[in-house]
Amino acid sequence: MSDLIQPKVLKGFRDFLPADEIERALLMERLVKVFRDYGFVPIDTPALEYSEILLRKSGGETEKQVFRFSDNGGRDVAMRFDLTVPLARFVAEHKSEIYFPFKRYHLGKVWRGEKPQAGRYREFLQCDFDTLGSDSAAVDFEILRLIKKALNELGVSNFKIHVSHRGIFNRFLKSLNLSEDSEEVLRIVDKLAKIGEDEVLKLLTDISSEESAKKILAYISGVSKELKSEDFEKTLSHLENLAGGPDEDTKRMRDIYALVKAVGIEDSIVFDPSITRGLDYYTGVVFETFLNDLPSIGSVCSGGRYDNLTALYMKECITGVGASIGLDRLLAALELLGHQKTKASFTDLLIFSLPEDDLVLSYKIVNFFEAEKINAEVYPEPKKMNHQYTYAEKKDIRWGLFLDKDSCVEEFDKAPQRFKIKLKDMTNRTEDETPLSEAVKKIRASKN
């Protein structure tokens, strides 16, 4: 017995039991429907890429978290840490085979060696949607609109999309003579929610004067004492003045917000200049989405515009904007908020097995229900009924079916609709003799 290997998973990695995986699959189905409704198409890319592909524009913090190693051929490879950088490589490699604007969605696992905590894992599922090949404010807006629609479809309504613009912040940093340190400043500011203002001020003071560090903190607080953070337009005007006046970036934000107001989703959008996104490839509008009832879990959907990402892989720059839903983090949040899981299986009806039953007849009945779009399965052997009831309970199967001991295939073949069975409602603990046609009606009614 001492030679047995202890069954366990690595820290930050997880197994998914059926109920959890069903919940995740159903959420993904809803998301895919939204993406398709908005004109997005699916792609897939490898989990493993050349390290130089993934790390050239990711930033030092990300490079520390990436799973990187030499493969059996001695190649320097890494597990993808997001789905955006592989997208840039994909577009550069397949440019002649795709069309622009290219609207894609991608659901897949990514890997980051960060510290595991509530809602944060080292292996997790991301759900990305991006549009490449257009620099229009309409495309930026459409991503925000899609975030709103997607989260609503998942049953999430109490949230805010926090929006900012890197260009405005970079212009502000230029006024402080900190342009050369802008990427480091952005990474420090991105840690504000994790480490707090005092620690951010300390880190900023390491690369600038104390006066400049305090000005940066004042900027990312976003508002003066007279302004409310919910007032997008006043906040934008305030930051515009700090950055030196109007320019194309502040115009872009006004154009986006005009579209936001036009479709009536302004209550879900807030201007938050502390949002900078730690990845170096973002160049324009950036955003993160927080649940009002559970802000501590972090952003459940984030992204932004990246105008230069494909320049690493091709001479032509193809601009893009997109977002990523952290589906596993969102599921963890829904569980913490008390949302109930849907089902433990997709089976509607279990046909019980008794010693005298004819399996041929049982499977003919399965075919009958399948034709009626009802998922049925046969318990494979005539075990004691308490075993079969437990099986149905564990799989959350509401309906059970017993064959009459005198039932025969010939009787079923003559008139399947009128063939009588015993239908057991295992939720209400009732049992009725009924023709199959009526059983179909009862089961369908319970699913609606």
Swiss-Prot record:
Organism for this UniProt entry: Treponema denticola (strain ATCC 35405 / DSM 14222 / CIP 103919 / JCM 8153 / KCTC 15104)
Family affiliation: Belongs to the class-II aminoacyl-tRNA synthetase family.
UniProt entry tagged with the keyword Thylakoid: no
Keyword Aminoacyl-tRNA synthetase: yes
Cited CDD domains: HisRS-like_core
EC number: 6.1.1.21
Subunit structure, interactors included: Homodimer.
GO CC terms, sorted: cytoplasm
Name this protein carries in UniProt: Histidine--tRNA ligase
Main subcellular location: cytoplasm
Localization per Swiss-Prot or TrEMBL: Cytoplasm
Pfam families: tRNA-synt_His
Known catalytic reactions: tRNA(His) + L-histidine + ATP = L-histidyl-tRNA(His) + AMP + diphosphate + H(+)
HAMAP family: His_tRNA_synth
Keywords, sorted A to Z: Aminoacyl-tRNA synthetase, ATP-binding, Cytoplasm, Ligase, Nucleotide-binding, Protein biosynthesis
Cited InterPro entries: aa-tRNA-synth_II (IPR006195), aa-tRNA-synth_II/BPL/LPL (IPR045864), Anticodon-bd_dom_sf (IPR036621), His-tRNA-ligase (IPR015807), HisRS-like_core (IPR041715), HisRS/HisZ (IPR004516)
Molecular function via GO: ATP binding; histidine-tRNA ligase activity
GO biological process: histidyl-tRNA aminoacylation
Protein encoded by which gene: hisS
Record field: transmembrane: none
